[in-house]
From Swiss-Prot:
One of its GO terms (biological process) is tRNA wobble uridine modification. NCBIfam families: mnmG_gidA. GO terms for molecular function: flavin adenine dinucleotide binding. FAD binds at G13, G14, G15, H16, A17, G18. Keywords: Cytoplasm, FAD, Flavoprotein, NAD, tRNA processing. Its cofactor is FAD. This is tRNA uridine 5-carboxymethylaminomethyl modification enzyme MnmG. It is found in: Cytoplasm. SMART domains: GIDA_assoc_3 (SM01228). The lineage of its organism: Bacteria, Pseudomonadati, Pseudomonadota, Betaproteobacteria, Burkholderiales.
């Protein structure tokens, strides 16, 4: 039967990509339907109970800056928070949180159920409705047909998924859930280029059977033994969200005996016996892969991470495996503190279908089928954070298409999301893709701390950011701007500053007049110290500093919430200290952007561009990049190729046309 109501956007899948896609489209005013095989698993953390990390935390902050759910849900469910790389530069600092699976999932479900314009329906999707070269809806396993103008497919590991434990395997989307076999077959009928990837998960341990006295303790920030100060928050709105109880993680290690046990199972490993065809993630390898690849290393760190506050289940991060269960049992018990460990769930590998993201347009719509968008692991990525960012992006662009508006694509210098999308659609994947700060050439501009400054205004323009977030953002931005201007206007004369005061705060006496902004650029000078100069005569009463503990409660000295004070000071300091480096990066961005967004003719026959090598013509014909910038990042396309292509376009297609003139004007 046809469902009586028609929708603007249908989202298939209720994982991290699907929930963000559905929320984004609904917030933009589109009638959105989220189809999931099980409402109880909305926002399920299928593998590790953590959010964030290097590069990944940056994506979470960007999703949050545009009104997404992941960071807020993490603040509600986070049971340990840490700032990674805290002693390094701001570009590579990242937030990571352990989350209570139940609390996290509950937060996501509440947001979904309370979002206007968003409907839920529990049924697996077996087919897509396609008319001509455009998708018009989805069909569930019992034949219910839902019509929509666009469909966002976020199938995770469910497409023809197969679980492996030793030489045994069975069809599954993840442990306990069936695979999407019919939907996978349907997508293959559409002739979309596809392949197989795999990922894995470790056995889960009953914490009551672990002797933690033999393990190292790893407290979170703000906990006894951890980095002093307040417990971090993930969301820019997180100051209003109380964290649950904070708990430590623990550390044990593999040893030579562990490695011998693992090697003894190689002959029954699906990875080494050819049972698994899919390629696994390079940066999250199985324990057997680690032992094989790093044979000279005699020990590996294993993190024992609590799954939640109401369970004893422990996630041993570092021993993801598809080895036979008897090997899993022995290797777990070979580690210190784990001698009597009881396994609650076996580890496994899962292989699944993905589709080549180079077959997507820049808005994540498939080239072959109009209105069909892909997001998450179906695009060859790995990780909750990468999935959430893609889901939001696809949901935004599906909604924009319904509204007959131009697609949105952040540039590589604007967001890690821009880096992620650009990498996928130009380079494709040969293994599961995960985000790192090293993938962003302009990472000094793409920090966690300024994600709101980069993206919240755009989120508001798109209809994603509510009034509360918008007001909070404007308040922060205005305070930062006013205080920055104040520091530039305040000058200190050496005749009016005692040498002892200058030495205390600045390290040495000053010999000429400086404004406070210039002094703040010095490496060893911080804002609080600067405000304490000469008895605090330069302090701003609106921004309390000194030795007071900036906690998450409202400061008694100011109407500003203390978490806002902290973020304002952070912005002012980073902007001052890295201004020169950021200016240099901006020059690089301008230089690179001269031709970056220059549109290439959709009907250009590259095979007829005789000046190009045959390989270049083939690659450009295959990928059909939309802009010159995208063309430059295709594998095998050299700067010389781009120059020759420009000559051809100027000579034959762009003569006396707007694209050429505007590009030359920029140059």
């Amino acid at each position: 039967m046809f469902y009586p109501q028609e929708f603007d956007v249908i989202v298939v899948g209720g994982g991290h990509a699907g929930t963000e896609a559905a929320l984004a489209a609904a917030r933009m005013g589109c009638k959105t339907l989220l189809l999931t095989h099980n409402i109880e698993t909305l926002g399920q953390m299928s593998c590790n109970p953590s959010i964030g990390g290097i590069g990944k935390g940056h994506l979470v902050k960007e999703v949050d800056a545009m009104g997404g759910a992941m960071a807020l849900a993490t603040d509600e469910g986070g049971i340990q928070f840490r700032i990674l790389n805290g002693s390094k530069g701001p570009a590579v600092r990242a937030t990571r949180a352990q989350a209570d699976r139940i609390l996290y999932k509950a937060a996501i479900r509440r947001m979904i159920e309370n979002q206007p314009n968003l409907w839920l329906f529990q049924q697996a999707v077996d087919d897509l409705m396609v008319e001509g070269d455009r998708v018009v809806g989805a069909v569930t396993q019992v034949g219910i047909k839902f019509r929509a103008r666009t469909v966002v497919l976020t199938a995770g590991t469910f497409l023809d998924g197969k679980i492996h434990v030793g030489l045994n395997n069975y069809p599954a989307g993840r442990a306990g859930d069936p695979p999407a076999v019919s939907l996978s077959a349907r997508l293959k009928e559409l002739k979309l280029p596809q392949g197989r990837l795999k990922t894995g998960t470790p056995p889960r341990i009953d914490g009551r059977s672990i002797d933690f006295s033999k393990c190292g303790v790893q407290p979170g920030d703000g906990m006894p033994g951890g980095t002093p100060g307040p417990v971090p928050v993930f969301s820019f709105m997180g100051g209003n969200v109380p964290h649950p109880k904070q708990v430590p993680c623990w550390i044990t290690h593999t040893n030579e005996r562990t490695h011998d046990i693992i090697r003894s199972g190689f002959d029954r490993s699906p990875m080494f016996t050819g049972k698994i065809d899919g390629v696994g993630p390079r940066y999250c390898p199985s324990v057997e892969d680690k032992i094989n690849r790093f044979a000279g290393k005699d020990s590996h760190q294993i993190f024992l991470e609590p799954e939640g506050l109401t369970t004893h289940e422990i996630y041993p991060n570092g021993i993801s495996t598809s080895l036979p269960f008897d090997i899993q049992y022995a290797l777990v018990r070979s580690m210190a503190g784990m001698e009597n460990a009881h396994i609650l769930r076996p580890g496994y590998a899962i292989e699944y279908d993905y589709f080549d993201p180079r077959a997507l347009k820049t808005n994540f719509e498939t080239r072959a089928i109009g209105g069909l968008f892909f997001a998450g692991q179906i695009n060859g990525t790995t990780g909750y954070e990468e999935a959430a960012a893609q889901g939001m992006f696809a949901g935004i662009n599906a909604a924009l298409q319904c509204q007959e508006k131009e697609a949105w694509l952040p540039k590589r210098d604007e967001a890690y999301l821009g880096v992620l999308v650009d990498d996928l659609i130009t380079k494709g994947v040969t293994e599961p893709y995960r985000m790192f700060t090293s993938r962003a050439e302009f990472r000094l501009m793409l920090r966690e701390d300024n994600a709101d400054m980069r993206l919240t205004e755009k989120g508001r323009e798109l209809g994603l950011v509510d009034d509360a977030r918008w007001d909070a953002f404007n308040r922060k931005r205005d305070i930062v701007s006013r205080e920055t201007q104040r520091l530039r206007a305040l000058w200190i004369n050496p005749n009016n500053l005692p040498a002892s005061e200058a030495e205390r705060v600045l390290g040495k006496a000053i010999e000429r007049e400086y404004n406070l902004a210039d002094l703040l650029r010095r490496p060893d000078v911080n804002y609080a110290g600067l405000m304490s100069l000469d008895g605090g005569r330069y302090a701003n009463p609106e921004i309390p500093t000194g030795n007071e503990d900036v906690s998450r409660e409202t400061s008694t000295d100011s109407a500003l919430p203390a978490d806002l004070v902290k973020s304002v000071i952070e912005q002012i300091e980073i902007t001052a200290k890295y201004a020169g480096y950021i200016d240099l990066q901006k020059v690089e961005v301008e230089r690179a952007s001269h031709y970056e967004n220059l549109k290439l003719p959709a009907d250009l026959d590259y095979l007829q561009v005789s000046a190009l090598s045959f390989e270049a013509r083939q690659m450009l014909s295959k990928h059909r990049p939309e802009t010159l910038g995208l063309a430059s990042r295709i594998q095998g396309i050299t700067p010389a190729t781009i120059s020759l292509l420009l000559v051809h376009l100027k000579k034959n297609l762009w003569k006396n046309t707007t694209p050429l003139k505007s590009a030359e004007a920029e140059a």
